Structures are given as structure tokens and as C-alpha cells.
Amino acid sequence: MEMDTIAAISTALGEGAIGIVRLSGDQAIAIGDKLFKGTKRLEDTPSHTIVYGHLMDDASEEAIEEAMVTVMRAPRTYTREDIVEINCHGGLVSVNRVLQAVLAKGARLAEPGEFTKRAFLNGRIDLSQAEGVIDLIRSKTDRAMNVALRQVEGRLSKKIGKLRQALLETIASIEVNIDYPEYDAETMTAKLINEKMTIVLAEIEALLATAKQGKVLREGLATAIIGRPNVGKSSLMNSLVHEAKAIVTDIPGTTRDTLEEYVNVRGVPLRLIDTAGIRETEDIVERIGVERSRQALKEADLILLVLNYAEKLSKEDEALFEAVKGLDVVVIVNKIDQTGRIDMERVRQLAGENPVVATSFLQEEGVDQLEEAISRLFFAGGVEGADLTYVSNARHIGLLNQAKAHAEEAIAASLTDVPVDLIQIDVTRTWELLGEIIGEDVQDSLIDQLFSQFCLGK
């Protein structure tokens, strides 16, 4: 497949020590040579080496920029094409000057994600690995990064490949039995199909069982902080964020809108939503905030319900317990540095199986216990382990669910008098759906949409 040579800035725009302009394609080295003047031509430079020199302007014969240029020859590169990376001084002017010079010599400005797209089209990575690159870039915690890294390395791809191979062998045996009954091949009976598909189904279900945790690591937990006004919701948010994000006062109704912030709680990314205190109010601005709080409650994955240790439980408190029934909740009894008036026995009764944590955010007490409770609620205290194959991508989850349904159909049919060649339809469809995860037989529009999510230069 012949492609033109592309170029883009690969480092973040802004002031910095170094900026990188990356080229990829058959003419990458030749274009570099049109600009670069050093001790030797780039064409004569061995692969995977760096050379020092200057980028020159043909017209004025003056230097455009001082640079270190890396030459990497196909196929041992990110895209499996020749790659040249020009390392120049950081800064908007210098990096853009180099990019414009490269484009003037014949390179085309790359589209978002086009370098990774070429890695996919040239067979260096499959589609699930490419999606792992996006997750790696967007990781908000070390745990999320480790999971994404395993996907980039191909751990999910290998699992999918193993399942597809087992299905392919089953399909092949069925077809041999039908088309060449005289051959001495294994007879693929309905009973044997049942056994093989049961194994495949168990593997698919095992992958889907990781989806909830995987989604949490990829997208973060939408976490609503709720409670009556002035119980310490904003102080809780500030304790987890470690900065004064919300206004903390003794005046009820201070938080009149929802505030959002991402925080890392023991490897679990939380998208914290500090809601306005839920109460009846005549203040029109505060009332809008209260309505948004109720909406945030409906959309949350985790609820942090804050109570005041220094006050008796109110009807509003009990109504909040009723509102979050059936959801994942951590109950926080705050202000334990003050004289206690709350009925802790009643609190535990209302909390049921949900954890109850006593805190004083003013004195920084109980924060560690709170973080431990959140981590245990979703990861039983930890997510690290030898097997970090988590399914987190919505596209993968959807395809696995479809594959699961067809595997179940094949198993159900194998227990009836349905002919083997009809059972094969569901077996084949299971194989096809798993293939779509790694990029087999996917539409070009899907590929274009996926890579458009990348930043320029990746």
C-alpha cells in the first residue's frame, strides 16, 4: 500500500525545552535531507541514530533552526514506514516554523491519529491495540495506564485470537464433515459443538466480567457528593482534591451549582461532582443548583452521602438514604471533632451493607479510611495483579455481548434436533464478531471515526 508522506507536531503546543516534528512515509528521509545540513546526509545515516545539524532556508541560505534529527527506517518503526523526527527548540514559533518548512518540501499535514492509523493499516498493531493507545494517552491513574499498556502490548488481542482459532477449527470441522464426508476427519456432532462452544462462552463471560472495573479505570467513576447544606460536602471535595476548589463557609447554600474535578483515589479515578445541598429553597439560583444535584444523583456510579456528626438525623437525611437505595454508596459522618448528637446506630441501620466512615475534614481525620472504603467498594481493595486484561472499551463490550448471545444460541441449538450446518451459522457469527474487536472486516467509516479521536502527531 503506497501512501504519501505525512508530518505533524508530536509534542504539546506551548513553551518547552524541546519540540518534535514527526514525518512518516517513503519520502520522509528525502524531505529531511532537503532541509537538513549536518556532518552527513540523512540518507547516509544508519537507522535509529540521531544526528546534529541545522535546518536551512534555500533562498537565504540561513539557518531556520538548530536541530537533532532522528532517522528510523522501515519496517522497525511505529508506522512500519520510514520515520524522521526533528527535535528542535520548544516554543510555538520555532516548532511551527519547522513544520511549515517540512510541508513546503512536500510533506502533507497529518490528520489526527494518522500515524497510529498507518501502524494499523500496515499491520503493526490491530484495532484493539490502537484503541489501547488512546486509553494510554488519556489515562488518569497508574492503574488505568497499566491496563491500557497491556492492551497496547496485545494481551486482549491474544485472548481474542485464541478464541477465534478455537471457533475456526470448529467451523472447519463442520464444513469438512458436510462437504467431504468420506474424509477421515473428526465428526463434529452437536454434542461436541456444545462442549467447544461452552468453553468459548465461559471465556467471553470472563472478559465481560471485567467490564465494570475496566470502564471505571477508563472513564472514571461519576461520583456525586450529596447531603444537606453545610455538612461538609465541599470540605470533602477539597480534601480529596488537595486544593480549595469549592467555597467552604458556614452559610447554608454556598455551593449553588455543581462543581466537577477528577481525583485519583488509590488508583481509582473519580470524577467528583460536588452538588448543591439538596433542600427546599426560595432562592431561584440555589433552586437550579438543587435540581442539577438531583440529576447528578441519577447519573452517578458512586454516591458519597455526607452527614453531620454534630446534628441529629433529620427527615432530609433519611430521605437521602431512601433516594440512594440500591446504589453504591459510602456514608460519611463528618465533623467528629465536634460534640456528637447523631444516632450512629440508626445511621448504620439506614446504610445497610454500605460502608460508614467517620471523618473530620477540618482536622484531616478519616480521609485514609474513606479512600480505602471507595477502593474496596469497586476493586475489593486492589486491581493490580498478573492478569491486567480488562475490557473497558464500549465497542468491545458491545461486540462481546453480541458474540455471547450467538454462542448461547449455538449451545441451545446443540441441545435440540437442529442440524449441525444450521448451528454453524451462530458459531460463524461468534467468530466474526470477535474479529471485529481486533479490526477484521470492519467498515472504513468506523476506522476513520476511531482514529479521529487521537491528537495530531500520534
From Swiss-Prot:
Co-factor binding details: Binds 1 potassium ion per subunit.
TrmE-type G domain residues: 220-379
EC number: 3.6.-.-
Entry's localization field: Cytoplasm
Single GO BP term: tRNA methylation
Gene Ontology MF term list: GTP binding; GTPase activity; metal ion binding
Superkingdom: Bacteria
Residue numbers binding Mg(2+): S234, T255
Binding of GTP, residues: 230-235, 249-255, 274-277
HAMAP family assigned to the protein according to its UniProt record, in alphabetical order: GTPase_MnmE (MF_00379)
Protein name: tRNA modification GTPase MnmE
Species this protein is from: Shouchella clausii (strain KSM-K16) (Alkalihalobacillus clausii)
